[in-house]
Amino acid sequence: PDEAAVTAHIHGVLNSFQQIEDLSCVTVILIDGVCLGGGYEMALAFDYIIGIDHPSCQVGFPEINLGLLPGYGGSGRAFARMGLEAALKMVLHGKPVRANDALSTGALDHLVADRNALANAARIALGGGIERAIAVDCADPDALIAAERAGIEARTRPENTPAPFAILDHYSHKDMNKDNIIERETKLFSELMMSPSSIGFRRVFQLNDMVKKGGRGGHQVGHIHVIGAGVMGGDIAAVAAMNGFHVTLQDMNAAAIDGAVERARALYERRLKNPDKVTATLERLVADPDGDGLAVADLLIEAVAEVPEVKKAVFADAERRMKPGSIMATNTSAIPLEDIAAALDDPSRLIGMHFFNPVPVLPLVEIIYTEASKIDFVDRAMFVGGALKKQPIRCKSAPGFLVNRALLPYVFKAIDAVIDGANADMIDQALVRFGMPMGPVELADQVGLDVCHDAGVVLGISEKSRKHLKAMIEAGTIGRKSGSGFYDWDGKKALRARGEYDAAAMDAMTLDLLAPLIDECRAAVDESVVESADMADAACLFGIGFPAYTGGPLFWHDGLGQPS
């Protein structure tokens, strides 16, 4: 559709909502559960909005997550009902508001204990026995807008994500009454709907849904055994137990298991909050230094050192101890599975489940298969990924799989540029300006230059950079964990002298540095490492943090939103 078609559709809905608002009788709407976006915009046309006093009852405007603002009069009716501050924050932040908070801001008028009390509450409202919310005047609108703008500017640019800036301007207008706000809202929504940014965000929404659907199904896995209690293995075990699996955690170092369990406890206390739930979840995470759980596990996930011979020894031993029909998975980040499978009598049992660090935060898991892998095992691993609340993407075994195959050439190109005299701070500022969560040079320091070097050897990337990294490693400068790399570090903070750089030069640098990432994604699609360009884009969006407003690297590069 074009802007005119979008506007015509909106006017039709607005007319319907206005008819509700104009009814001569008292109108009451009852909310039981989640009521977001257009549903809540309709609710705002009623005289009284009553909800259930339960965490499941939530209202809000999530449109900002699609690069939009409410389109059916929500920004105007929310302003009239709640006042500037509450309306602005609801529209700008896009987070669902729970019932008690909604009552305090005027987003709801009244709460009842349960569904059975709704009819009685409606009768009371119709009789005038419930006091309607009254909009609260903002003491200093300019200060509010300025504070919100500063927060937005610290995270993004209007060229990348115009919607939050448009919303701030929308609520800064001199004519702040409901009807004028709704009129401006319609125009803004229609413009934003056609913007490259919103099209990109909406594509990410669709990709997210597509990937999650791939993880829905019966996995027939109740018991997961994890070998390796380091950061990756320990966190994989913790997340598995948190999602209902019985987990045994094995490591030669008992102290490593203890540390992993304590990290899990802290995670559960943050996420679950309820002490009984924390205790119950910890009971599903069992220390198993001798690996007794192997005999009864439905799925093994190996997360030991990224050394082929070490992994092969682990799997050769595990195969002898595991029951027939159980799945064996490696968390390797780059080693071809065929190399590891050579140690097995039955290589069809081996698949890859490549999680990303930190496991409790990053959503992607690459499910890796070889020509020998049992398709049923691959499917079940996809479903386990979904049960872990991850976004599983199927990848054929190949060096680096998809994410590291795309990411590392981009990082190494940045290192090449630094070796050739480019300013590391300018590189990192340019890519953060584009929307990456971190610049490639700082990322190399964060990951560890030793890790980067070894991955570069596996993938055969840039001999020049590998030699440079090897010299830095021999000098003891391996990045954040040594206190010095391309930057000096103070704990988790890079000590960078931040300069001011020409915007056009940074844009050109960004395009140049992203070229190998895009090339590798395209090659991976051509070689059927992933099934489609959609899946390549999804992997980069959810695994690398490629900016959502682009819709993914291939989608962006194919023309939409690409700078000329």
Question: What is each residue range found by the language model?
Answer:
Residues 1-11, 23, 46, 50-51, ...:
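N-terminal glycine-rich phosphate-binding loop for ADP-containing cofactors
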Residues 10-17, 33:
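Generic internal hydrophobic packing segments that stabilize the cores of diverse globular domains
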Residues 29-39:
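Gly/Ser-rich catalytic serine loop of serine hydrolases
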Residues 16-29:
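Conserved catalytic cysteine-centered active-site region
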